[in-house]
Amino acid sequence: MAKMEVKTSLLDNMIGVGDMVLLEPLNEETFINNLKKRFDHSEIYTYIGSVVISVNPYRSLPIYSPEKVEEYRNRNFYELSPHIFALSDEAYRSLRDQDKDQCILITGESGAGKTEASKLVMSYVAAVCGKGAEVNQVKEQLLQSNPVLEAFGNAKTVRNDNSSRFGKYMDIEFDFKGDPLGGVISNYLLEKSRVVKQPRGERNFHVFYQLLSGASEELLNKLKLERDFSRYNYLSLDSAKVNGVDDAANFRTVRNAMQIVGFMDHEAESVLAVVAAVLKLGNIEFKPESRVNGLDESKIKDKNELKEICELTGIDQSVLERAFSFRTVEAKQEKVSTTLNVAQAYYARDALAKNLYSRLFSWLVNRINESIKAQTKVRKKVMGVLDIYGFEIFEDNSFEQFIINYCNEKLQQIFIELTLKEEQEEYIREDIEWTHIDYFNNAIICDLIENNTNGILAMLDEECLRPGTVTDETFLEKLNQVCATHQHFESRMSKCSRFLNDTSLPHSCFRIQHYAGKVLYQVEGFVDKNNDLLYRDLSQAMWKASHALIKSLFPEGNPAKINLKRPPTAGSQFKASVATLMKNLQTKNPNYIRCIKPNDKKAAHIFNEALVCHQIRYLGLLENVRVRRAGYAFRQAYEPCLERYKMLCKQTWPHWKGPARSGVEVLFNELEIPVEEYSFGRSKIFIRNPRTLFKLEDLRKQRLEDLATLIQKIYRGWKCRTHFLLMKKSQIVIAAWYRRYAQQKRYQQTKSSALVIQSYIRGWKARKILRELKHQKRCKEAVTTIAAYWHGTQARRELRRLKEEARNKHAIAVIWAYWLGSKARRELKRLKEEARRKHAVAVIWAYWLGLKVRREYRKFFRANAGKKIYEFTLQRIVQKYFLEMKNKMPSLSPIDKNWPSRPYLFLDSTHKELKRIFHLWRCKKYRDQFTDQQKLIYEEKLEASELFKDKKALYPSSVGQPFQGAYLEINKNPKYKKLKDAIEEKIIIAEVVNKINRANGKSTSRIFLLTNNNLLLADQKSGQIKSEVPLVDVTKVSMSSQNDGFFAVHLKEGSEAASKGDFLFSSDHLIEMATKLYRTTLSQTKQKLNIEISDEFLVQFRQDKVCVKFIQGNQKNGSVPTCKRKNNRLLEVAVP
């Protein structure tokens, strides 16, 4: 019997209604009740056609396990109960199999679960796509980008402990197999005002608390931070700790994620240094100080914080202090410097902190994009995931809410357009007559905001750029003049009389009728936030930082690239970003996730109907259902429809052998459903009213009950017959076993009797044999005993004889030993006597010889005594000298000049020689500590000392700086891959220098490369080689004696490289570059390179000899030397 495959459906075991399109009747109350019923049963997902509604459960649910992923993998969208995995799988399969770019739009208010929804989408796609080391690395980098962005872009709010304070759009790129290749992240409207001020009960961005909680003491000391939150004005104290959040563990997670994404250690440390600088900026406080002209000037109260900030960022303290006290306004050739009062100084401080953090966040996004972007250039498929603010209506709505709601208006507009477009395309594709759908078109609201002439954003930009006094009130007056007659704009001060007595509309506000309802905006702060003004002095101060990251964040601060053009406003930038986003979304197939927050307490099992109703209205969910139901409420392919309802018709049950459409037609005709309630498309059947579908479900449920009864009847009959046959078979078996048992029992009794008789007979025979054996044994034992007694008597006799013989032998031995001892003692006595006589003779002879010698040499004793005493004394003095020198040895440092003094004059030469030998020895010991690389560094430093010491004023500042050579890391930076491939030799120097234009003295950035044989110049942006000079053609290097980085490279006349003339450069690493060029040229050409140090020298520019003259510059022009071509024969360099 063939096994029947059971196919599930969305309608099986449905709690409430799984698809709101099928809700009957459809109104706000039934919509909310259906959501609540499903929420109470932990069903947090509900469909509106292909749109997923997600209600935040505020608890963990067991519906995201790997088993669930496999359950929804490659399944039809309506085959299982509603789930975010179903939408993710549908989008992924459409991208992989149909080659359609996809986008998933996730919207909802803060705390509704948008960020978690985006993570679930990404984790599902990562789980179902291909495997492999490279693919897994890409997936891991894409997933680990989330913790980094959350740390820097999320914060605790009253609505959400992990609220995204920026909009994020990620394009995930796939190859033709559906494997991820990389991604690109775009961010929108970071809430940077949170950096300097947070509402009560909320926190600053997570990274500040994570850094202070999780960083080691060593790192905190390096960043000049303390672990106490109360030490920093930018951190709110009432919500510093969040229940269930471990900031220290999260910090370790973020550091690990940064490493996985591709951040190098020095990059991560640079980022944390910027975060620390932002924190410490909030601790700078100002006090007023009166000037002679009567105006107040701001002064910093405590300069310790400023000093630590400058040490972190590498900015000169006086430069930053001046930027907080003065503001310079430039207009063409004029500069005007004005003092800042205390309020302006605080504004400048906060503006700097906000700009520094927001630019750092943008840099982080770009840096992550560099790591996760696809490296291959093959054609890619794209899935975009949009996680952005939902519609916001607060008690106080400002510029941020206005911009956010504008973005949501655009998203609502594209949602309605794409939904209608999708409906229309399906009707046309299925050859169904198209029914026009009436809906509210919010294009008029979008035009009110974004119109280039009369739009609110355009008028706000116009007001910001207008000369004269510009305030929020003047902006509101302009709105009242232009927008008064607009049907979606309301203002108390407008010409429209119907709002003059509206007390709910304050004079300083205006109201817009959005698609989600009316929103009242406070006009205060609109102009200031739109300007987003950062004083030029602060930008220039940041650009002067030695901290490379901070310097790169403020390119407009470069004095060489002064741009007097006003930067674009925040509103215009966001408008352009939204336009780009909308254009991008329109090229993709949309998928929607609408997130809803069930309560404001962030608690599980609580469903606030009023709050949910508010969200349903501004998300336009009822409008969405009505659009879906305007034509046909339900549509389904013929095959699953016939499979589900075939039991309702005898002709189609149990199997239909024709086409599926014919079977559905037969089925519906049999059920007598009115023809106006359904329509047959090319591949689907369309049902107009949900009641028809529910009728089909009721009939199916009744039929299933009937079929269940039939199956039970047949099963019970089969069970009874099977039981009877089993009992009959058992009776036969039992009878056979009983007969066998009776025969076996009778046989056992007979066998037992025979065994008993046999055992008695065998016992009698055995006892008889035992008696005979015992008698024989006793006889043998008696014979043995007699023989033993006789042998014992014989042995005792022999023992007595042997003992007597042994006693006689012992007596003889004792007598012999006593005799030998007496003989030995007599011989010993004789030998001792003879030895005493010999000793006496020797002593007498020695005494006689001594007497004889003393008599002969007595006359010499006194003369020799003095000489011996002198030699002994001299030897003792030298010995004592060496012992004292051993204890007084100086340190092993070669630069230690100390040496013990000598005690006696005659030791002078020895003392000096010993000092020389000791110095040579300790120098050798010091040199032996160095590695070959360190020796090379010291050789270069020694070479630099010989070339520039006491000759070049810049030299002392270079002593403490290590020579690095490859500052650009060309081998690691993919930007310079083309340049790296073009150079086959070892790169000795890779540095960005300023090349001085021969014609006008202006500078251009070039990459300066020195290899073993050549000197090369390359374009900084493209990496293309512009000039290549063999080292044999370099004849001389000229520079001034002053504290500047200008130098000239002279080329051999007539060489190909010298066609345009000598080169003139400016570099921050002049000493290192000149030293390495000198050593490389010497190694290559075996000739010393001429180094000329003079404040005037000649260079060859084409056919002209030009004098380069160094003069004292004006301090007002800053600390950077300037170069100017005076005439055809003179080029002046002004050094401050």
Swiss-Prot record:
Site of covalent link Glycyl lysine isopeptide (Lys-Gly) (interchain with G-Cter in SUMO1): K287
Record-annotated TH1 domain positions: 952-1136
GO molecular function terms listed in the Swiss-Prot or TrEMBL record: actin filament binding; ATP binding; cadherin binding; calmodulin binding; microfilament motor activity; phosphatidylinositol-3,4,5-trisphosphate binding; phosphatidylinositol-4,5-bisphosphate binding
GO cellular component, one term: filopodium
Cross-link named Glycyl lysine isopeptide (Lys-Gly) (interchain with G-Cter in SUMO2), sites: K287
GO biological process: actin filament bundle assembly; actin filament organization; actin filament-based movement; endocytosis; post-Golgi vesicle-mediated transport
Superkingdom to which the source organism belongs: Eukaryota
Domain IQ span(s) in chain numbering: 704-733, 728-748, 750-779, 779-808, 808-837, 837-866
Modified residues (Phosphoserine): S60
Annotated effect of mutating E969K: In a melanoma patient
Stretches for region Actin-binding: 578-600
InterPro entries: IQ_motif_EF-hand-BS, Kinesin_motor_dom_sf, Myosin_head_motor_dom-like, Myosin_TH1, MYSc_Myo1, P-loop_NTPase
Chain sites annotated for binding ATP: G108, E109, S110, G111, A112, G113, K114, T115
Gene3D superfamilies: 1.10.10.820, 1.20.5.190, 1.20.58.530, 6.20.240.20, Kinesin motor domain (3.40.850.10), Myosin VI head, motor domain, U50 subdomain (1.20.120.720)
Claim: Membrane is one of the keywords in the record: no
Keywords: Actin-binding, ATP-binding, Calmodulin-binding, Isopeptide bond, Motor protein, Myosin, Nucleotide-binding, Phosphoprotein, Repeat, Ubl conjugation
Alphabetized PANTHER family for the sequence: MYOSIN, UNCONVENTIONAL MYOSIN-IB
Family statement: Belongs to the TRAFAC class myosin-kinesin ATPase superfamily. Myosin family.
Protein's name in the database: Unconventional myosin-Ib
Organism, as annotated: Homo sapiens (Human)
Taxonomic classification: Eukaryota, Metazoa, Chordata, Craniata, Vertebrata
